[in-house]
């Protein structure tokens, strides 16, 4: 199987698996809600996000994978709120006081406007954690050599799916 076919199949399988997890948690229905505007924003954030998250993957793999979903939620929130005004937000706006480390809390509290200890925030945290754990399991089952070109591309596809999942969750919440 050629690499691009492998990556496409991996991404499709992951998207379907994560959609099922979100459905089981009552966070999505039968398809991913999407917008080209939102999906395109990943392309501008991905280089900075990937540069930060790759450093965390060895010690905090679920965090490194999960935070892309929170970015998707933030972008979907902006898209709904006032896209013309908010579409050019720099990546740095997504980071909390501790940078990458508290990005999730910053997005939930300061962008989505939820109380961190509230039921909705906890539900979001649980589903994103479940998705990230499942994604990590899928990556590991592939038996790809760590730090290889193939590992990077699989990781990049994983992050893109997580971003889409987060965006879909937020669009569904609205």
What is each PLM-predicted segment?
Residues 1-174:
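Intrinsic-disorder/low-complexity detector
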